């Protein structure tokens, strides 16, 4: 890339599964999974909060499932690695509070007519607007800054759990700044400008050991060599000490990492969180179908970069609006792409749930609750499946 080209810097951050907010997301989604596994028609709005030695789950759940909420909380904390007060939370001895009520009957009748409606008649669970985004800068059709920050967080957890870096503790944050070139609306990454990792650690390790291990075992396997150069800046545990972490260090709450969950600051966000919500909540299902639409547009070669917005009214099945913007990278006009999108995708919440198979539990949603909901290579992430779009290339 010629030096004279105008470039800009863009930064995305991530947190790994031991961050207190992410712990809460995972507990909320583990509860959702347990409900859907027994009763696919479960209506779930499950929030979680945590602080030192305490986890509380609260919200509205209507289900035929028999769910042991306390057991789910403790198991989720244990699986992440919160097994003693030293690391930030003791899964077996912390206090667990449960305040779960039924879904409001007013909402229930408006959304699904107390289960009397056919799937295509099911109304949106609330009003709102959601966005999907895709870009051709990575194989995942996701922003590189976000992909790298997310993968660094996942790698931190991997080397903690497999014993490569035994000094690691569950909590940690990452941030990556990428230098980009704007090629007529498409984003072209040139190099990684800055890598920031702040990870919780035990008392035994020195800052020099932390920096050396992070470079060798976390950064090197994740960031392709072509993006690193002698000018790349590394901030590795720049605060100097991060022993106290998890809920002991900071309070946590479901739904506070919505940019990390999506596109790392690229595109746009309607503000609605995902975790702990069943598919009638369009905050979640609407964002999933919008991602599938945007990804399908880019995968089809219709555009190099794309954002899709949809909006809903509570109790109304059809979206109020659908919007497509290709940032000037479209091969045909955006209004024609919009027409193709409307013909290809069914944006009614009941049909989204069926077409994307969103009523299945197990550990399906728990997997989404750390390391991003999009750009993942996993069969359960059905919204990542590209739908073929029919269009004719304009004559040269």
Curated annotation (Swiss-Prot):
- Disulfide connectivity? none
Q: What is its cofactor? A: Mn(2+); Mg(2+); Co(2+); K(+)
| Cross-referenced PROSITE patterns | ADOMET_SYNTHASE_1 (PS00376), ADOMET_SYNTHASE_2 (PS00377)
Quick one: which residues bind K(+)?
47
GO CC terms: cytoplasm
A GO molecular function assigned to this protein is: metal ion binding
Do you know which SUPFAM superfamilies this protein is assigned to? Answer: S-adenosylmethionine synthetase (SSF55973)
Q: What is its induction?
A: By salt stress, in stems and leaves (at protein level). Follow a circadian regulation with higher levels in the light.
Give the Enzyme Commission number.
2.5.1.6
Which Gene3D superfamilies does the record cross-reference, listed alphabetically?
Answer: 3.30.300.10
Q: Which residues bind Mg(2+)?
A: 13
- Pathway(s) annotated for this protein in UniProt: Amino-acid biosynthesis; S-adenosyl-L-methionine biosynthesis; S-adenosyl-L-methionine from L-methionine: step 1/1
Name of the protein in its database record? S-adenosylmethionine synthase 4
The protein's gene is named SAMS4
